[in-house]
């Protein structure tokens, strides 16, 4: 075997970008040739406990586009991305040995599955005498800069935010994207391409809020368009609860989830916007949302696997139903509640749903149907193009009333929310064509239509559109009693 000069390896994970990438920056500083690797882990394409695809078609295609874009970006700066498939804790050390890597640089993750991979990887590298250096790069605030330890993290977001603001935490500056990299060593490696079944074909629905394209390039373009070309940041707080169209919110979440956009870079651009355009409630609110994302990540660090347990962070032993029939009505958007149905159909057909929609459909599953909240969390995991393990499971804990900030029984009044956030029924008609003829004052509660009105508007309940699967207020009150008494109805 010919002598291979020493090199370093950068292992890309949920950090598919060149900007603000500390592992890449440290590798560059080493002065050695860099090999960049992305490894598709087949476990991420397996099934959830409920038998859903762990990574559904919307997210898998967005991931594939993001990896491809990273490869193109690395090529432009003189390097290349090695793409392979297998268990990273086995595959990465094998590659590292073959290229004579002295050090592996990577970003650290938070939850159990990812941490297990890291630990086993480091174990294998130690046997081979290869150094592993992990860095933190997924949040706005670095955990080392927090005014408390992770174990002392406040259980309420408001206290978390106020403590950070009070201590005037400095956000660390971004690392520059490299303009040139040394080429990776020219060594023939046996790489396993991901199988086509990882990336099922998807059909783009023209009703989608945005034609989401994976990758750093598309993420930066979206930021440029939303902040600078469209000048929409100044109105973010007023429009963020919308549900129709590309620009009611930033829509950065898919790129944040895969690390195509760095939260620190977004923060940096918000601060520039405040200097060059305007500083107002909207600019502050976008930073506020980035802090929510941080909070859920730190909560996951603090509580570990409790996040995924039936009893949640508080280990509350609430009884939950396992009603497959009603779950299927919820999942497919056939509950008879237009706001729930429209949002679930949007999710299924596009991989996206507004934040307002997520809160309402989750509340309906937990507080009206009383179905195991983990079923909903798993369906979101499978479908969402912007799935983020910490935010998803943290939000479901919150909605189910088992999160670390659980207070009195809380639920979303679906009919009222529908009228408040979609007064003319524009969003409902967008996704429920069977209700398109109903006027704005009738569309939110079609179950109240008389036989004459059904005929007048061309909607026959139970035929064209389902009758409600539960009585809204009765089901909420029944659930309230169950949670107060802790017994199954």
Swiss-Prot record:
Names of required cofactors: FAD; (6R)-5,10-methylene-5,6,7,8-tetrahydrofolate
Keywords: Chromophore, DNA-binding, FAD, Flavoprotein, Repressor, Transcription, Transcription regulation
Domain Photolyase/cryptochrome alpha/beta: 6-140
Record bears the keyword Lipid metabolism: no
Cofactor annotation comment: Binds 1 FAD per subunit. Binds 1 5,10-methenyltetrahydrofolate (MTHF) per subunit.
InterPro entries from the UniProt entry: Cry_DASH, Crypto/Photolyase_FAD-like_sf, Crypto/Photolyase_N_sf, Cryptochr/Photolyase_FAD-bd, Cryptochrome/DNA_photolyase_1, DNA_photolyase_1_CS_C, DNA_photolyase_N, Rossmann-like_a/b/a_fold
PROSITE patterns, A to Z: DNA_PHOTOLYASES_1_1, PHR_CRY_ALPHA_BETA
GO molecular function: DNA binding; DNA photolyase activity; FAD binding
BP-aspect Gene Ontology terms: photoreactive repair
Protein origin, superkingdom: Bacteria
Record-stated family: Belongs to the DNA photolyase class-1 family.
Reported function: May have a photoreceptor function. Binds DNA; represses transcription of at least 8 genes, including slr0364 and slr1866. Does not encode a DNA photolyase function. Its disruption does not affect circadian rhythm.
NCBIfam families assigned: crypto_DASH
Protein name, UniProt field: Cryptochrome DASH
Source species of the chain: Synechocystis sp. (strain ATCC 27184 / PCC 6803 / Kazusa)
Gene name linked to the record: cry
């Amino acid at each position: 075997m010919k002598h291979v000069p020493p090199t370093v390896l950068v292992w890309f994970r949920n950090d598919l970008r060149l900007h603000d990438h500390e592992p890449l920056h440290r590798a560059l500083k080493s002065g050695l040739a860099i090999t960049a690797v992305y490894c598709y882990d087949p476990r991420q394409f397996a099934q959830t406990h409920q038998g859903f695809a762990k990574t559904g078609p919307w997210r898998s295609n967005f991931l594939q586009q993001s990896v491809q874009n990273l490869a193109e970006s690395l090529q432009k700066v003189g390097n290349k991305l090695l793409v392979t498939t297998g268990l990273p804790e086995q595959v990465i050390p094998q590659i590292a040995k073959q290229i004579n890597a002295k050090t592996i640089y990577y970003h650290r993750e938070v939850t159990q599955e990812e941490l297990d991979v890291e630990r086993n990887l480091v174990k294998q590298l130690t046997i081979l005498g290869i150094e592993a250096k992990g860095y933190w790069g997924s949040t706005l605030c670095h955990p080392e800069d927090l005014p408390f330890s992770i174990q002392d993290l406040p259980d309420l977001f408001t206290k978390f935010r106020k403590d950070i603001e009070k201590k005037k935490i400095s956000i660390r500056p971004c690392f520059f994207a490299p303009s040139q990299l040394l080429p990776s060593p020219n060594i023939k490696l046996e790489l396993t391409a991901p199988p086509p079944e990882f990336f099922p074909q998807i059909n783009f629905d023209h009703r989608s809020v945005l034609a989401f394209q994976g990758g750093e390039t598309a993420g930066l373009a979206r930021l440029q368009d939303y902040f600078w070309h469209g000048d929409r940041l100044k109105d973010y707080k007023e429009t963020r609860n919308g549900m129709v169209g590309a620009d009611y919110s930033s829509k950065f979440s898919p790129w944040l989830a895969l690390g195509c956009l760095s939260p620190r870079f977004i923060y940096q651009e918000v601060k520039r916007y405040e200097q060059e355009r305007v500083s107002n409630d909207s600019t502050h609110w976008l930073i506020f949302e980035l802090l929510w994302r941080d909070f859920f990540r730190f909560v996951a660090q603090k509580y570990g696997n409790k996040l995924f347990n039936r009893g949640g962070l508080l280990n509350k032993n609430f009884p939950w139903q396992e009603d497959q029939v009603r779950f299927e009505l919820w999942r497919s958007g056939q509950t008879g509640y237009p706001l729930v149905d429209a949002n679930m159909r949007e999710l299924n057909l596009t991989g996206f749903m507004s934040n307002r929609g997520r809160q309402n459909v989750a509340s309906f599953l937990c507080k009206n149907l009383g179905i195991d909240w983990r079923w909903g969390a798993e369906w979101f995991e499978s479908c969402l193009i912007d799935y983020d393990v910490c935010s998803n499971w943290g939000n479901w804990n919150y909605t189910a009333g088992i999160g670390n900030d659980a207070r009195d029984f809380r639920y979303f009044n679906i009919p009222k929310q529908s009228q408040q956030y979609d007064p003319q029924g524009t969003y409902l008609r967008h996704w429920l064509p069977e209700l398109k003829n109903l006027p704005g004052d009738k569309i939110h509660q079609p179950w109240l239509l008389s036989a004459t009105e059904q005929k007048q508007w061309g909607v026959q309940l139970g035929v064209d559109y389902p009758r409600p699967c539960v009585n809204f207020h009765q089901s909420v009150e029944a659930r309230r009693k169950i949670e107060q008494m802790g017994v199954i109805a």
